[in-house]
């Protein structure tokens, strides 16, 4: 093996993110082997059927050929469609430009496309291989097959891309607790999947039924079906507002008929469906740092977030693109200035971790904050007035202000920078709006905001480099 060039990468986990990373690394001429715990026939599902929502932040990290194929099989959603308690329906656009939309796609379709792309690029996928230990100094993983036989595999770099229940991460934390810290928190809300007939639904938006601390969400698919999920607390004092307070099929049916009367007729089996299985739990996993020696974590293995921003997969693809970019940069430097494979691997993962840990932690906080918006705020007239003000401010002064959702979903500004910018601008708008009729005084508030920033330039997406 040449000491001046990295030649091989071992990836544990052959899900969408692992396959995307493999394709990027193969473009650099690296030998890439992916080892997947599941058998090939079982696939690499995550255990739930949420559609994955891709935005330009994540899509831009994928090859153009993959993006084209995804658009042929996914659903373009340009707005929220809000179903209010009184039967009224309102819409909220996700952004202001043609590419300000979500691409909603079933996980299985995304998985198949990215796996095929990785194989065409020359990556090798080995199924039925469970990671049971790692050696970060040697970039090695101990794998066990279905017969119980085990063997070590090694590369110049070891990547843990094996999801929220990452064996790579857990092995590193167990062996080096002082060097890698991990927290795992289960939030109060859980989820349950519901079968709901499509009917005459608008296929161009994400359908939401916000009901305080609980809400129903339905994502249209191209085959005129819905991927539908109910989110609500798992337990609490008010029985009707929590999963634990719905002990029978009849109680569930009464709840849905009361809360979602406009679509209850499309939920023929909702009572039996929810009574026959427990709700799923939602967890937040934060890790710091994302690396140890010559091993590095990518995607949910490093940072599992709740699905309320739909940014988990986008953040994970950014991880992959960032790691691949840093590898390319440092390999070029080594070839021109000298160094070793070990130097490249350890420098790359250190810089990657420095950038991506801050972004991952910020997204976890932003995702929890968006739960309040989805379940309650979208119903509030005051919230809608504020959103209208922010949208108008952006239209008039895009150099000074961009709404939070657009920064999160449709730019490459790091999530932690988004958080800082939004906290500053929100504080200013809060002070300007206090005690005023926001709708009637919209123009005056915008003028005062612009005056405060006269002669300055607020941090905007074009001025911040992505990690």
For the regions a protein language model found, what residue spans apply to each?
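Conserved FAD-binding catalytic core of PHBH/FMO-like flavoproteins
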Residues: 116, 132-133, 138-282, 286-287, ...
């Amino acid at each position: 093996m040449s000491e001046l060039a990295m030649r091989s990468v071992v990836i544990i986990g052959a899900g969408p993110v692992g396959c995307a990373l493999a394709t990027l690394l193969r473009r650099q001429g690296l030998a890439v082997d992916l080892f997947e715990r599941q058998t090939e026939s079982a696939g690499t599902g995550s255990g739930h059927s949420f559609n994955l929502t891709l935005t330009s932040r994540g899509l831009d990290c994928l090859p153009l050929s993959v993006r084209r194929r995804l658009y042929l099989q996914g659903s373009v959603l340009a707005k929220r469609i809000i179903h209010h308690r009184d039967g009224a329906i309102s819409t909220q656009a996700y952004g202001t430009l043609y590419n300000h939309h979500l691409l909603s796609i079933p996980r299985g379709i995304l998985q198949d496309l990215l796996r095929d792309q990785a194989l065409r690029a020359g990556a090798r996928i080995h199924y039925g291989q469970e990671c049971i230990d790692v050696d970060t100094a040697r970039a090695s993983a101990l794998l066990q097959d279905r017969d119980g036989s085990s063997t070590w595999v090694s590369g110049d770099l070891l990547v843990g891309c094996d999801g929220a229940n990452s064996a790579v991460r857990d092995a590193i934390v167990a062996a080096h607790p002082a060097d890698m810290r991990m927290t795992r928190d289960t939030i109060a809300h859980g989820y349950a999947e519901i079968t709901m007939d499509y009917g005459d639904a608008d296929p161009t938006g994400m359908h939401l039924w916000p009901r305080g601390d609980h809400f129903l969400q339905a994502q249209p698919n191209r085959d005129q079906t819905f991927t539908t999920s109910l989110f609500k607390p798992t337990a609490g004092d008010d029985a009707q507002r929590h999963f634990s307070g719905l002990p029978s099929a009849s109680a569930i049916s009464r709840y849905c008929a009361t809360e979602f009367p406009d679509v209850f007729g499309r939920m023929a089996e909702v009572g039996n469906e929810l009574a026959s299985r427990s709700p799923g739990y939602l967890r937040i996993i934060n890790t710091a740092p994302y690396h140890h020696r010559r091993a590095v974590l990518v995607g949910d293995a490093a940072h599992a977030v709740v699905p309320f921003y739909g940014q988990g997969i986008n953040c994970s693809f950014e991880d992959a693109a960032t790691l691949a970019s840093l590898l390319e940069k440092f390999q070029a430097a080594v070839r021109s200035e000298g160094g070793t494979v070990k130097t490249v691997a350890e420098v790359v993962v250190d810089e990657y971790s420095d950038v991506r840990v801050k972004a991952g932690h910020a997204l976890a906080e932003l995702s929890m904050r968006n739960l309040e918006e989805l379940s309650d705020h979208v119903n509030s007239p005051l919230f809608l007035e504020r959103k209208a003000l922010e949208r108008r401010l952006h239209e008039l002064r895009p150099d000074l202000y961009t709404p939070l959702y657009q920064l999160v979903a449709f730019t490459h500004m790091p999530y932690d920078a988004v958080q800082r910018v939004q906290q500053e601008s929100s504080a200013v708008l809060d002070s300007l709006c206090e005690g005023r009729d926001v709708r009637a005084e919209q123009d005056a508030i915008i003028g005062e905001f612009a005056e405060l920033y006269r002669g300055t330039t607020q941090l905007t997406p074009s001025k911040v480099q992505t990690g």
